């Protein structure tokens, strides 16, 4: 079984944010323990005498809360160590996913979250289908989402996708309704937070500092980034983001990186 851990970045209701991102990591069940250990080792390396430290990328970058007294050089090293921990998981034990939703008059607030959820459910299902067809490896999937304002609605959406299908068709490989947890209680949801924040920085600010290390682990097939989706009203034939660019030139990530 693969467990897809998801968290969000950006405020879907805030007009100052042009994008809303839902992102995370699909982790093979036997790798979850080792990935959690890798994050625990990041804490042991930098804060060996502390109580469990919650890794949230945005406060780490900006120096908020616990991170206010931590030197910037240490905070930067922590983020890079977190990226290294995620990318250390051997393939096919992990695949990253993110949906960057460019907000519009009809696609903001709850609709933006619903579009992102539908996109990632579909792409996760495609990954599981591909593993079966290409490797004769029948795996089921389970979603674990960070608790938030829309998490109860997300349960309804995903159940609807399972029973009635998405706009692209039925989801055939999800084992159950989604489950929800606090990021404080789950290192794997902290990984999802890192992926979502890295994607938000790339699309909102053209800051590729975190995404550059994570992008190689996004789900892809024949050079096309299927794990990263850009939902926009602009012409995707000229968009130079990694998602759109790889569809025109497979194997290439484009100038943003």
What are the roles of these predicted feature ranges?
Residues 1-257:
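Phosphate-ester processing/binding pockets and catalytic centers
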């Amino acid at each position: 079984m693969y467990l897809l851990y998801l968290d969000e970045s950006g405020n879907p209701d805030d007009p100052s944010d042009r994008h809303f991102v839902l992102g995370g990591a699909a982790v093979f069940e036997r790798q979850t323990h080792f990935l959690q250990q890798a994050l625990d080792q990041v804490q042991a390396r930098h804060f060996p005498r502390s109580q469990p430290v919650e890794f949230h990328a945005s406060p780490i970058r900006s120096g908020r809360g616990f991170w206010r007294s931590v030197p910037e050089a240490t905070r930067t090293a922590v983020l890079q160590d977190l990226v290294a921990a995620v990318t250390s998981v051997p393939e096919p034990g992990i695949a990253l996913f993110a949906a960057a939703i460019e907000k519009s008059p009809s696609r903001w607030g709850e609709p933006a979250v619903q579009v992102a959820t539908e996109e990632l459910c579909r792409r996760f299902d495609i990954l599981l289908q591909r593993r079966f067809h290409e490797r004769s490896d029948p795996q089921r999937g389970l979603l674990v989402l960070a608790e938030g304002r829309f998490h109860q609605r997300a349960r309804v959406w995903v159940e609807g996708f399972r029973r009635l299908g998405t706009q692209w068709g039925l989801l055939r490989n999800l084992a159950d309704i989604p489950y929800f947890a606090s990021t404080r209680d789950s290192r794997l949801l902290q990984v999802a937070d890192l992926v979502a924040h890295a994607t938000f920085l790339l699309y909102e600010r053209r800051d590729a500092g975190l995404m550059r290390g994570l992008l190689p682990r996004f789900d892809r097939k024949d050079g096309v980034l299927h794990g990263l989706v850009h939902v926009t009203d602009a012409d995707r034939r000229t968009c130079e983001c990694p998602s759109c660019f790889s569809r025109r030139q497979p194997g290439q990530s484009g100038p943003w990186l």
